[in-house]
Amino acid sequence: MKQLSDLKNVGKATLADLRILNIYTVEELADQDPTVLFHELERRTQTKQDPCVWDVFAAIVHEASTGEATNWWSWTEKRKNLQKKGKFQHII
């Protein structure tokens, strides 16, 4: 069984963020929405997160749900499109 730390884009910082979000398994991560995770992390930490955190969340949720590992930066364009449409913004 794959551990969170086995996912391509999960390092120490992301693993710590996932713990803050009470996500401890790949199975728990697979059903998540990257935007919800990003907003919840900002809410729980009361800190404005770097938008690239969303990119990492998108990449790891994708890998957890499909098994396909992608580079986190391949999600940047999608996030920027969401930002332009007003569907992604900071809550802090």
Which residues make up each language-model segment?
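C-terminal extensions
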Residues: 1-8, 12-92
